A protein has these predicted regions:
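A short glycine-leucine-enriched loop at secondary-structure breakpoints
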Residues: 120-122
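N-terminal acidic, proline/glycine-rich, low-complexity intrinsically disordered segments
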Residues: 1-18
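Acidic, glycine-rich flexible loop segments
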Residues: 117-118, 137
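Long, compositionally biased stretches
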Residues: 25-105, 125-177
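Short beta-strand-centered segments at strand-helix junctions
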Residues: 108-116
Length: 177
């Protein structure tokens, strides 16, 4: 699977989805180390991933169960500082745009968060939530949605994560942001 275009959502520039490179032709497997950081040429550009932002997803992500090692990186454009990149360290063509979510925002009910934490054996105080974001080109510009149904639940102490599918259907797969 290395080097294949596995994720087709063009999301490098949420404001103008047209400026996004085609994932099938973008990125390479170039990697370098720089002061405890991994530098990866990704479809989102050159990404710096520090060792303390490397995460293990023991079950992989939905549809990508064979990939377990990911890193969190910032986008190079400060206009999109609210977004992060979840970059696969095993296949540099595989990357997702994600949006950190404060557990206290109410987008996900506290009872549902507690149920997820109990299921995943994560202390709610150590929980980091990230939503997978999709950008679609529309006639009006870009449509940006986040997946509230299957958020990434990360244990900040152990640096392990799971994509947890919420039991309630009230959480949309495509929540407009």
């Amino acid at each position: 699977m290395k080097g294949s275009a596995m994720y087709s959502t063009n999301a490098a520039d949420p404001a103008t989805a047209e400026e996004v490179p085609d994932p099938a032709g973008a990125g390479s497997d170039a990697t370098a180390k720089d002061n405890n950081r991994l530098i990866i040429d990704s479809r989102f550009g050159s990404l710096a991933i520090s060792q303390n932002s490397v995460l293990d997803f023991p079950n992989g992500l939905l549809g990508f169960g064979e990939f377990h090692s990911f890193g969190i990186a910032d986008l190079s454009d400060p206009r999109y500082a609210q977004f992060k990149v979840l970059q696969c360290l095993e296949d540099h063509q595989l990357a997702f745009l994600v949006l950190p979510l404060d557990p206290n925002t109410g987008f996900i009910d506290r009872a549902d968060l507690e149920a997820a934490c109990n299921s995943l054996l994560v202390d709610i105080g150590d929980l980091v939530i990230m939503l997978v974001v999709t950008v679609r080109k529309t006639e009006q510009g870009a449509s940006i949605t986040a997946n509230l149904r299957a958020p990434l639940m990360i244990d900040s102490k152990t640096h392990t994560g799971n994509q947890y599918v919420m039991r309630s259907e009230r959480y949309p797969v495509r929540f407009q942001i």
